[in-house]
Amino acid sequence: MNGTEGPNFYVPFSNKTGVVRSPFEYPQYYLAEPWQFSMLAAYMFLLIVLGFPINFLTLYVTVQHKKLRTPLNYILLNLAVADLFMVFGGFTTTLYTSLHGYFVFGPTGCNVEGFFATLGGEIALWSLVVLAIERYVVVCKPMSNFRFGENHAIMGVAFTWVMALACAAPPLAGWSRYIPEGMQCSCGIDYYTLKPEINNESFVIYMFVVHFAIPMIVIFFCYGQLVFTVKEAAAQQQESATTQKAEKEVTRMVIIMVIAFLICWVPYASVAFYIFTHQGSDFGPIFMTLPAFFAKSSSIYNPVIYIMMNKQFRNCMITTLCCGKNPLGDDEASASASKTETSQVAPA
């Protein structure tokens, strides 16, 4: 084995020289230089500085403007709530541990940080699944006369939390575990050991199949069908030009969110899968640290995409920031609000 396994940790460094110490008790400067830990801390500080205000603003603006409280926006707001969980439950912890060079909060703190990071990522993934299904049902119309309403949105939000908890909670109950990963300053699922006494192998397989592969299959199926339907409708001119444009723009926004999610999380999932399927292989701490910390940037991109591609929300945000007055005028926002009734969300 090219790493060192302890009772509640796995350090990707051989202990042949006797330098390996518990990541809960001693700085891990034998894994990387102190300046590299400082860089991680600076990165986490940047994510907190950007992630909190932009996600909080998304929630606040929606509360302030009734026109934004539409069913589909509930799912988008769910993403903002998940991101805030990651910021407060995960990023602040990782910032502090990176400054110290090891996970100073012990196994309990590791469980908390790992839980919130996993919960936030899974809520985001399952929210994108709900958005993909909504787009498929609204645009492809497999069920005639279906309208995505408030009850559907609430059920969709509840579904994302149930599925996310089904992934994030088991390690707290003894099925798998959360351990420090990479440079040992942040925590995640144990992909490094089989650990039969906690059935770790079965949980990792369950997680990859149920909470990664299946959501990806659903998302790609829905958007594959959607692309064909949009092209066919455009060719046959079955919808009005305004409706077609509105649906295309809403769909484009959601697709960009999916692509951004894949860019952030696929590297992490791929590295985790490689480590799990190559138990005991030789890999350095940076190998897992880079994709793990890159995945954390997902807390920023969803609200940014939403703000950039949604004129109605953008106008409401400007009105809120300018103390109730929009220097650009509110006509554009009103026009955008009435573009599409089917999707119940204003496109860009």
From Swiss-Prot:
Glycans are attached at N2, N15. The chain crosses the membrane at residues 37-61, 74-96, 111-133, 153-173, 203-224, 253-274, 287-308. Zn(2+) binds at E201, Q279. It is found in: Membrane; Cell projection, Cilium, Photoreceptor outer segment. The keyword Transmembrane helix applies. A motif ('Ionic lock' involved in activated form stabilization) lies at residues 134-136. This is Rhodopsin. It comes from Canis lupus familiaris.
